[in-house]
């Protein structure tokens, strides 16, 4: 009964005119970002963080959430029409979606992707509503030692699921943790790593770091290597899939939804891995595996359902534990902190309208996407003709104005420029910046809970292994590190990310 009352509160919050407007803005902007290859939801949300400072907390988080799952929808459009995924999670969709388009079935492929995405998004949103409250109650029982261990698990999982070298991912997490130390020590009041600059006494501005590492770095990378884009079909027709298509997509959509719902919770690239896992499963269970790569319906329906389900369930650890499952969720935590909200299990009890409003808005956003996306395909295709050299200077100007408006601090602009160059250098060195951001976000929380646990135990480090939940979480973190270095697992992991590239 409580679930229905809470959902009623959520829908009452999400259906206000203001929140419906920002939900619509979010999903449309997300679709646009998904359609334009090279920008991405992470960079977009990072660049929009300054704007959220001026909005109501519920409205801003609803808009950012809409951008995230809207980008999953939009990414499939370019994957199918021009064989260039707008989002990395749509890379698998391009394999069979583009082949369907070449056979004159672009409309059916887009409709299959949209229907699968809507079903998966709807189901996974209800899973969030069902599982978030009990997990929140469990999290309320956690002490400092348990939170420290939980964050260690989150960081280790992000390393295991990061692209490329595990050693590089470890280095990125370490760098993020170090950046999180900049500022004033919360217990002694001693400045740390501020280089004598008073403006950094409160630490590095999260918005400046995120905009630099993700936004500016991505812009520099795309300007250096602009891809040629030629749309395959000027006119997309026959959007309604045939009866055979519907029969062929039922199983893949159900399996993809299940796979994505589970993998989306894991820290790291849950939606991306879910798409690849779904494609692998569909190929193995298919009676005609030879059709994959040549326009198989299951090759579009399964991965699209999986990546959208993964995008939705990644909100579970964010809303219940305050732990980001991916870089976008880390940015969402940043948006909550900007609004004065402490991420974690207390959000559900202290601000139920915010908690349930976000969940309800996800269902509304999915409905908006499936209604709006197919009629607007012509517009999205035309937007693909905008050159990067026109688009990106405008974006950079808005970023600079937005970052400065948060604190009116010119040093934040220096930080954006510096971290933009750092982020670009990391991309050139094939170091994924996502673990860095997770380390930067979790670093202060990790330190605070570590020191609090040590104070409560009077300096006894055994407190972390004497408390059952904390010990189990630390054992899990150690197990993940050991498993990921096993030769067979390491080889399979490298194979997945090579296929994605």
Residue ranges: model-predicted function:
Residues 111-227, 338-492:
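Membrane-embedded alpha-helical modules
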Residues 27-41, 71-83, 158-163, 258-267, ...:
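Transmembrane alpha-helix interface/packing and boundary motifs in multi-pass membrane proteins
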Residues 69-74, 115-127, 179, 301-315, ...:
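Membrane-embedded alpha-helical segments of transport systems
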Residues 41-50, 64, 79-99, 130, ...:
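Re-entrant/interfacial helical elements at transmembrane boundaries that shape
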Residues 1-60, 137, 191-296, 381, ...:
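Helix-loop-helix hairpins and the membrane-proximal interhelical loops
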């Amino acid at each position: 009964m409580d679930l229905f009352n809470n959902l009623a509160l959520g829908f009452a919050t999400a259906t206000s005119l203001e929140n419906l407007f920002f939900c619509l803005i979010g999903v449309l902007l997300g679709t646009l970002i998904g359609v334009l290859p090279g920008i991405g939801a992470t960079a977009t949300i990072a660049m929009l963080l300054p704007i959220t400072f001026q909005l109501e907390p519920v409205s801003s988080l609803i808009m950012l959430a809409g951008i995230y799952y809207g980008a999953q929808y939009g990414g499939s459009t370019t994957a199918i029409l021009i064989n260039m995924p707008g989002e990395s999670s749509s890379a698998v969709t391009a394999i069979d979606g583009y082949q369907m388009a070449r056979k004159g079935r672009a409309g059916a492929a887009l409709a299959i992707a949209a229907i699968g995405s809507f079903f998966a998004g709807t189901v996974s949103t209800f899973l969030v509503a069902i599982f978030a409250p009990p997990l929140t109650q469990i999290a309320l029982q956690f002490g400092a030692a348990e939170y420290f261990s939980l964050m260690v698990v989150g960081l280790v999982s992000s390393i295991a699921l990061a692209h490329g070298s595990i050693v590089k991912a470890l280095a990125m997490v370490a760098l993020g943790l170090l950046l999180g130390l900049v500022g004033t020590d919360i217990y002694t009041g001693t400045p740390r790593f501020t280089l004598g600059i008073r403006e950094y006494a409160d630490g590095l501005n999260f918005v400046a770091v995120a905009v630099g590492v993700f936004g500016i770095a991505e812009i520099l990378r795309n300007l250096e290597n602009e891809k040629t884009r030629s749309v395959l079909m000027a006119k997309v027709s026959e959007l309604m899939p045939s009866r055979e298509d519907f029969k062929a997509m039922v199983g893949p959509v159900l399996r993809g939804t299940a796979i994505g719902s589970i993998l989306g919770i894991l820290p790291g690239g849950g939606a991306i891995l879910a798409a690849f896992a779904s494609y692998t499963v569909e190929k193995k269970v298919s009676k005609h595996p030879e059709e994959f790569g040549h326009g198989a319906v299951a090759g579009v329906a399964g991965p699209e359902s999986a990546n959208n389900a993964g995008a939705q369930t990644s909100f579970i650890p964010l809303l219940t534990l305050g732990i980001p499952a991916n870089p976008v969720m880390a940015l969402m935590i940043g948006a909550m902190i900007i609004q004065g909200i402490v991420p974690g299990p207390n959000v559900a009890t202290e601000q139920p309208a915010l908690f349930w409003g976000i969940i309800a808005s996800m269902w509304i956003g999915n409905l908006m996407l499936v209604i709006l996306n197919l009629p607007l395909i012509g517009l999205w295709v035309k937007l693909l003709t905008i050159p990067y050299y026109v688009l990106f200077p405008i974006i950079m100007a808005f970023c600079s104005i937005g970052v400065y408006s948060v604190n009116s601090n010119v040093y934040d602009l220096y930080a954006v420029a510096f971290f933009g160059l750092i982020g670009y250098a990391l991309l050139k060195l094939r170091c994924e910046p996502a673990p860095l951001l997770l380390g930067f976000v979790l670093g202060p929380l990790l330190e605070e809970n570590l020191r609090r646990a040590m104070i409560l135990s009077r300096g006894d480090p055994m407190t972390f292994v004497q408390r059952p939940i904390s010990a189990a979480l630390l054992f899990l973190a150690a197990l993940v590190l050991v498993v990921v270095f096993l030769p067979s697992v390491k080889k399979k992991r490298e194979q997945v990310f090579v296929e994605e590239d």
